[in-house]
Amino acid sequence: MALSDTQILAALVVALLPAFLAFRLSTELYK
């Protein structure tokens, strides 16, 4: 089953958004 570009982009956003938020939170706590 081939993934469409839209599905790939959606998966990237879903994966990166929590990672980005966790990174921001960790940098805020580190200061």
UniProtKB/Swiss-Prot annotation:
Membrane-spanning segments: 6-25
Which keywords label this protein? Membrane, Photosynthesis, Photosystem I, Thylakoid, Transmembrane, Transmembrane helix
**GO BP term, pick one:** photosynthesis
Q: Which GO terms describe its cellular component?
A: photosystem I; plasma membrane-derived thylakoid membrane
Q: How does it sit in the membrane?
A: Single-pass membrane protein
Q: Where in the cell is it found?
A: Cellular thylakoid membrane
Domain of life of the source = Bacteria
Known Pfam families for this protein?
Answer: PsaM (PF07465)
Name the principal localization, coarsely classed. membrane
Q: Which SUPFAM superfamilies match?
A: Subunit XII of photosystem I reaction centre, PsaM
UniProt KW Transferase keyword: no
What family is reported? Belongs to the PsaM family.
Q: What is this protein called?
A: Photosystem I reaction center subunit XII
